[in-house]
UniProtKB/Swiss-Prot annotation:
Keywords: Aminoacyl-tRNA synthetase, ATP-binding, Cytoplasm, Ligase, Magnesium, Metal-binding, Nucleotide-binding, Protein biosynthesis. Tetramer of two alpha and two beta subunits. Binds 2 magnesium ions per tetramer. This is Phenylalanine--tRNA ligase alpha subunit. It comes from Chlamydia abortus (strain DSM 27085 / S26/3). NCBIfam families: pheS (TIGR00468). The gene is pheS. One of its GO terms (biological process) is phenylalanyl-tRNA aminoacylation. It catalyses: tRNA(Phe) + L-phenylalanine + ATP = L-phenylalanyl-tRNA(Phe) + AMP + diphosphate + H(+). Mg(2+) binds at E256.
């Protein structure tokens, strides 16, 4: 059979097979079978080499014309297949507008985040600047510079998460105090919100992770009266009612004197379940910055004095909203969270 006849037969065979192709994969396989390196057109190249010299130009042109014809058919078929596949995809993804809609509840702030923001805003209005520090802290900043003795129980692994012998997950936001005192100049008035971590048993009253806000003020002539006045204003604003403040002597390594801060309960001393029938709510630990902490930060305690107060945000949220179990804040139960959104 002459090459011209073979080319014509190849065209007809290709068109017949092309009419049966309905997918991109089948079209690719057909293209490889005809135009690939080992395809049918390879035999025409071999025959062209054996063709007499005076016929090679004509035969070569005929082979190229046939190849171009097939390539054009493949291109057109590919375009048609793509359009069909897109149309099918559109049908699969088509939205049935007759179906009932699914309600989407709007998000809201977590109750802990809301209380944290409220607390920080109050301190900012009282003239404090917001500062933060890493959750991963050196043992020196978390303990030593805050006047914790080497044998203090808080340094033990059963109370603190150690990442290595000299690095811990901070147990309080007082590490901000150390960092700010060492790099700032009085007056220094800072509020420091953040996460804290303690190796404790999880119960209704305690958790291994919690939020704390520390506020401290350093300058000349800062006194315990300044601390009391600030706390009274803060809790009056936070609880949105008139409150009485009660200070009880306590011990914290980084303050002297150290105090526990109580505010009067809404029951007005009548006694209720919230205050455990005492008439008072324990809300914070505070005191005057310890002279050794000031020395560790490069300040002369004979010249400068300051106060510091630390409060747990979950504790405040529990008191503000009558929540009895701290674990509820971490359980992501929408029935609980939606009450505050």
């Amino acid at each position: 059979m002459a090459i011209q006849e073979e080319l014509e037969a190849t065209k007809q065979q290709f068109c017949a097979e092309l009419s049966q192709v309905n997918s991109s994969k089948d079209l690719f396989d057909l293209k490889v079978r005809y135009l690939g390196k080992k395809g049918l057109f390879r035999c025409f190249a071999d025959k062209l080499r054996e063709c007499p010299a005076d016929q090679k130009a004509l035969m070569g042109a005929s082979i190229n014309d046939c190849k171009t014809y097939i390539e054009n058919l493949i291109r057109d078929k590919n375009h048609a297949i793509l359009l069909a596949e897109e149309a099918a995809e559109f049908l699969r993804e088509k939205i049935d507008i007759t179906l009932p809609g699914e309600p989407h509840c709007p998000g809201g702030k977590h109750i802990v985040k809301k209380v944290l923001d409220d607390v920080v805003d109050i301190f900012v209005h009282l003239g404090f600047c917001v500062r933060e520090a890493p959750n991963i802290e050196s043992e020196e900043n978390n303990f030593s510079l805050l006047n914790f003795e080497e044998d203090h129980p808080a340094r033990q692994m059963h109370d603190t998460f150690y990442l290595d012998p000299k690095t811990v997950l901070r147990t309080h936001t007082s590490n901000v105090q150390v960092r700010e005192l060492r790099k700032g100049q009085p007056p220094i008035k800072v509020v420091a919100p953040g996460l804290c971590f303690r190796n404790e048993d999880i119960s209704a009253r305690s958790h291994v992770i919690f939020h704390q806000v520390e506020a401290f003020y350093l300058d000349r002539y800062v006194t315990l009266s300044d601390l009391t006045a600030m706390l009274t204003e803060f809790y009056h604003t936070f609880f949105e009612r008139e409150i009485e403040l009660r200070l009880r002597h306590s011990y914290f390594p980084f303050v002297e004197p150290g105090i526990e801060v109580d505010v009067s309960c809404e029951c007005r001393q009548a006694g209720c379940s919230l205050c455990k029938h005492t008439g008072w709510l324990e809300v914070a630990g505070a005191g005057m910055i310890h002279p050794q902490v000031l020395r560790n930060s490069g300040f002369d305690p004979e010249i400068y004095t300051g106060y510091a107060v630390g409060m747990g945000i979950e504790r405040l949220a529990m008191l503000q909203h009558g929540i009895s179990d701290i674990r509820l804040f971490c359980e992501n139960d929408l029935r609980f969270l939606q009450q505050f959104s």
